[in-house]
Amino acid sequence: MIIKRDNSLSKIDLRDWIWTPFFNDLVDKLSVFEIEPYPVSHDFLSKESITGSRRNPVHVTTLTWAAKFEKIKQVRLACIKGGESLSVFNLLIHPLNDYDLPFFGADFVTLPNGHLLALDLQPALKLDNIHTENVWPRLIPLHDHWQSLLPSGGEIPKEAEPYFSPGFLWSRLPLSKESDNIISEILRPAFGEYLSLYIELLHIAKPLKKERALKILEGQKAYINYRSTKDPARAMLCRFYGKEWTEDYIHKVLFNI
């Protein structure tokens, strides 16, 4: 079945997609803003492929939901579903550089060997106290509470440290009914609280002077360059859709400065 979508705000409807409640929460919380479709080429709104073997083919679907509104350059969500063992919710909220705001990032991935769960308000300028002073004192208590209820995901690479906050929520879970319960009863409310905090920060953010806005832009460029260069989904997407489509998707949709 080919999924047709009119624009980037068309509903995400993937059968048995574990992250549907998270998508619904996102749309509900963003309803307080006057959101508009973010321009996304039709080739990236919906893409399908068949992988696996001839005896056991697997249908893979990738859908993109994207919006823009006041203070936000882009909200984009990459949604992937492939059989029983592949399910992806990859969300990035990219603020305009006219405001001292972090990125909002959520990357929830289900693979055959388990769930990888990452959630953060990611700084554009981690070492800049002005950029972080209104965020971290409110974010860290949320992190400490929810991380105490989740197993740690382990160390993050040194090169990635500048792009994560002390409030980085990071966990790995095996595929099990217990993990499904953890996702619905712990991860989902954690996602809601992180997103609510981000929305509060949006409401109070004030426009910056030009010099400061340019400094934020440089930090955003470094972040986007790192994310686009190191995107762990690149190999998987290349396997499904080919290198040309994948590189265009990464640079024109997922991480577009």
Curated annotation (Swiss-Prot):
InterPro entries: Ferredoxin-dep_bilin_Rdtase, Phycoerythrobilin_Fdx_Rdtase. It is an enzyme of class 1 (oxidoreductase). It catalyses: (3Z)-phycoerythrobilin + oxidized 2[4Fe-4S]-[ferredoxin] = 15,16-dihydrobiliverdin + reduced 2[4Fe-4S]-[ferredoxin] + 2 H(+). Transmembrane segments: none annotated. Its EC number is 1.3.7.3. The keyword Oxidoreductase applies. GO terms for biological process: phytochromobilin biosynthetic process. It comes from the Bacteria. Keywords: Oxidoreductase. The keyword Signal does not apply. One of its GO terms (molecular function) is cobalt ion binding. Belongs to the HY2 family. Catalyzes the two-electron reduction of the C2 and C3(1) diene system of 15,16-dihydrobiliverdin. This is Phycoerythrobilin:ferredoxin oxidoreductase. It comes from Prochlorococcus marinus (strain SARG / CCMP1375 / SS120). The gene is pebB.
